[in-house]
Amino acid sequence: MNTLVVLLGPTGVGKTALSLRIARRIESPVLSADSRQLYKELVIGTAAPTADERAAVTHYLVGLLELTDYYSASRFEEDALALLQTLFKQHRAVLMAGGSMMYIDAVCRGIDNIPTVTPDIRAAVGNEYERHGLTPLLDELKQADPLHYDEVDRKNHRRVLHAVEICRMTGKPYSSFRTKTV
């Protein structure tokens, strides 16, 4: 039987040191569940494992992306589950460590089946946000999906933009893709 061991905590509390000890003890690599450590350029401020730490214990999903690369919890779920299939062929237990609860939840509980936004829709909504601000997009979201409009953090422009993107792309309310709330 395979076991996924999860170590979750905020940045800077010693997860890396503890994860190294645990990984050695259970003879496991470390699968990073940190949304910022995925990016090569975000070494400072993320408490990413050093080169020496990465040499001591194999780490996955660290320093792979450019800052301009799009990555989501849904994509993390796909990547991590595929990687776990391979790792469980070599290890009885695998340690997943990080501070991104959404990423950990995606692997452990699954994620809503929200479609990936096409680049043209993402660019159009982004351009509208830059030109006119958030208010017109909030109005659009209120019309397209009143349920999500009532729930979304209206000050978090990324969440608003994403919901509008999904509504435009699919012609359906964003909330119709959500299967659960956490």
What positions do the PLM features span?
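Phosphate/pyrophosphate-binding catalytic cores of soluble transferases and nucleic-acid-acting enzymes
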Residues: M1-V182
